[in-house]
């Protein structure tokens, strides 16, 4: 792939600067948590109006990484059409609505986190709650807290297993969960 833009968190600045140099990336923005004057936030405030370009359903929208059924990571070329129909089909199957609030514990650089667990919810107007890093106790706390209102939770097997082994699992209120699912294991 030939990346054109890199948006990165300040915690990865050293690695990002090496990538920018090594991959000849011409555009970059650093996101700093809790800094409303970060490069990223300033770009959002001062950015130019978005100009759409003509595209087709077959045009690529992103390159995602997946281990698929083999367990070995590989780049998957995702077209506009694939992303759209994936969001529609998974959203319909899981009964996703604009009232859905999904807890996403998988990374968004991976197709599971983005295309299976985030995009279908966003496509239907729902909300996505992202965990920066998975912690079984914190995930149970988020699910248990009515202020978050989590209605859906999908993940690979490991997070489910870790949550079930956590001491707070038995006392967590799962009554608001309308949909849960597991997938992605070889």
Model-predicted segments: where are they?
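ANL superfamily adenylate-forming
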Residues: 11-57
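Conserved pre-ATP/AMP-binding loop-to-beta segment of ANL
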Residues: 46-65, 72, 95-101
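Conserved S/T- and glycine-rich ATP-binding loop of Class I adenylate-forming
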Residues: 6, 60, 66-69, 102, ...
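Conserved AMP-binding/adenylation subdomain of ANL enzymes
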Residues: 84-101, 109-151, 161-162, 166
């Amino acid at each position: 792939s030939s990346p054109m833009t890199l948006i990165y968190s300040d915690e990865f600045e050293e690695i990002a600067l090496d990538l920018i140099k090594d991959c000849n990336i011409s555009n970059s923005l650093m996101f700093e948590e809790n800094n409303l004057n970060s490069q990223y936030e300033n770009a959002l405030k001062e950015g130019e109006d978005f100009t759409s370009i003509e595209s087709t359903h077959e045009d690529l929208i992103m390159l995602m990484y997946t281990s698929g059924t083999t367990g070995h990571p590989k780049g998957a070329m995702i077209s506009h059409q694939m992303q759209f129909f994936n969001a529609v089909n998974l959203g319909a199957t899981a009964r996703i609505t604009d009232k859905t609030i999904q807890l996403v514990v998988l990374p968004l650089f991976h197709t599971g986190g983005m295309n299976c667990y985030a995009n279908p919810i966003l496509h239907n107007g729902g909300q996505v709650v992202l965990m920066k890093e998975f912690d079984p106790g914190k995930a149970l706390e988020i699910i248990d807290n009515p202020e978050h209102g989590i209605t859906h939770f999908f993940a690979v097997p490991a997070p489910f297993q870790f949550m079930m082994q956590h001491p707070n699992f038995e006392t967590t209120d799962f009554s608001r969960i309308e949909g849960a699912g597991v997938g992605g294991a070889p």
